[in-house]
A protein has these predicted regions:
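Catalytic phosphate/metal-binding cores of nucleic-acid and nucleotide-processing enzymes, i.e., regions
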Residues: 1-114
Length: 114
């Protein structure tokens, strides 16, 4: 697959995640959750301060035939500043599958359910 095709698939994946999050949080505006341009450094989904209050995540998005959500979660963790208060979240969808999956670190999951 060409690099341009891979980037297009990644961009579409990011846009899908933005739509899902905006639907789940209707109180947020389109400016609160945005897909970042492909090839730019940092998180794949940019969150406004208002959106960060709802979910303090650093989001890494993967979409394709094969990917590793644990490695994607580690990728998000690696770019975060220590003690920033955000949690790394990896989201991914396989080709020909409509279901999105999310991976978080166990300590964050436990914090959510306590």
């Amino acid at each position: 697959m060409k690099t341009s095709s891979c980037k297009a698939k990644g961009r579409l994946g990011q846009q899908e995640v933005v739509k899902i999050l905006l639907k789940a949080f209707p109180e947020l505006a389109e400016d609160d959750i945005r897909s970042t341009p492909m090839g730019s450094q940092g998180e794949d989904i940019m969150l406004s301060p208002r959106a960060r209050k709802e979910f303090p995540w650093d989001i890494e998005v993967k979409r394709g035939k094969a990917f590793n959500l644990v490695n994607a979660c580690k990728q998000a963790r690696a770019r975060m500043k220590p003690d920033c208060g955000y949690f790394p979240v990896a989201m991914g969808r396989y080709d020909r599958d409509k279901t999105w999956y999310a991976t978080v670190e166990l300590n964050y999951l436990l914090e959510l359910i306590r």
